[in-house]
């Protein structure tokens, strides 16, 4: 186990452009809960070096809910789940665009439309593209998370002004068969590569709390590093009644913080955005995500669960002496 001085020295070497060997990085995620706070100085150093005290804010809209053919064990939208959720087909262009247009006058950086299902038809992608094209992207950048798409569909989004595509790996490859059996891990990897080839930046991360070991946390982090993704959404499982993982063991707040700090050391210059399960899993410790290395948060509601409202998150940033990220436009 590394001494506190060695931990900070590791972060300084990363800051200088060095890449520690994987064994050194593995020692960080393997630390016990009661030593998690020792990772904060290095993680905070790296976050501030690459991102200062500004925080990326993003908001999502569930554009198509439920009735998903896939069997992801954590997901309430799967047809295999018996969760009590609202299910509906793709909503109208106006309803897809309106939340994004309302964000134009707020500090929110990105607005994303997220849909259930393995993927969308080209007609549905066209609807989403037209909706997102109606948003002033100098005021709020647009993203999409529409499942497995082909190059032509990804190009359609790009041509509509969408600059980022979201598609999670969800878990380490060695765990994936326990998470989903209706599509492969490699299909997810290829979708990420296709989005990059289409000229889109990529938001790609996973969900923690699926039963992964420390080494599987590292396996996922190293895969994200190898894919050179631009942004990493970090979700912590909120077990939902009616899903295969409704009785999953709850993550400790300190483990959540250690995962964030580990990711910051592995992916020092990437946007790390804490998304689903932030308050549910971290409770009173959720403001510490920034000192653990997070450079962004998702604000507002999630797909089928509620989140914190924007006003509360802006007040939190002010209390911490942080500011919303300046808009790209």
Swiss-Prot record:
Record's subunit section: Homodimer.
Domain spans labelled Radical SAM core: 50-278
Pfam families registered for this protein in UniProt: BATS, Radical_SAM
Its biological purpose: Catalyzes the conversion of dethiobiotin (DTB) to biotin by the insertion of a sulfur atom into dethiobiotin via a radical-based mechanism.
Signal peptide from the UniProt entry: none
Family membership: Belongs to the radical SAM superfamily. Biotin synthase family.
Gene symbol of the encoding locus: bioB
Top EC class, one word: transferase
Cofactor(s), names only, from the UniProt record: [4Fe-4S] cluster; [2Fe-2S] cluster
Gene3D superfamilies in alphabetical order: Aldolase class I
Naturally occurring in which organism (per UniProt): Desulfosudis oleivorans (strain DSM 6200 / JCM 39069 / Hxd3) (Desulfococcus oleovorans)
GO biological process per UniProt: biotin biosynthetic process
Top-rank taxon, per record: Bacteria
Name used for this protein in its record: Biotin synthase
InterPro entries the UniProt entry points to: Aldolase_TIM, BATS_dom, Biotin_synth/BioAB, Biotin_synthase, Elp3/MiaA/NifB-like_rSAM, rSAM
Documented EC number(s): 2.8.1.6
CDD domains noted in UniProt: Radical_SAM
Known catalytic reactions: (4R,5S)-dethiobiotin + (sulfur carrier)-SH + 2 reduced [2Fe-2S]-[ferredoxin] + 2 S-adenosyl-L-methionine = (sulfur carrier)-H + biotin + 2 5'-deoxyadenosine + 2 L-methionine + 2 oxidized [2Fe-2S]-[ferredoxin]
HAMAP family assigned: BioB
Alphabetized GO MF terms: 2 iron, 2 sulfur cluster binding; 4 iron, 4 sulfur cluster binding; biotin synthase activity; iron ion binding
UniProt: [2Fe-2S] cluster binding residues: 112, 143, 203
Bound cofactor: record note: Binds 1 [4Fe-4S] cluster. The cluster is coordinated with 3 cysteines and an exchangeable S-adenosyl-L-methionine.
Keywords for this protein: 2Fe-2S, 4Fe-4S, Biotin biosynthesis, Iron, Iron-sulfur, Metal-binding, S-adenosyl-L-methionine, Transferase
Residues annotated to bind [4Fe-4S] cluster: 68, 72, 75
